[in-house]
């Protein structure tokens, strides 16, 4: 039996330089915040094509933990951005976030 969680992790993989736009759109749609991580594709030259479309090596990953109710609006807002209308310019997936908690003490 699968239990529905209250939160989901939204992973948005974008070409380098596009993460801030994705984060702005996500915030407007209800995201509380997020983390941007620099990334690099590590596939072979053949792997760097997605259904015949060249994929840039330099990437950024936007990670957002959001309440389930906001996830559809957040993903739709990001998908509608003009910079993501080109084929293979972004990849979005969501995963259930079953255990969410803060560690340590707040920074002063």
Residue ranges and their predicted role:
Residues 1-108:
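Positively charged, small/polar-rich N-terminal and surface patches that mediate targeting and assembly
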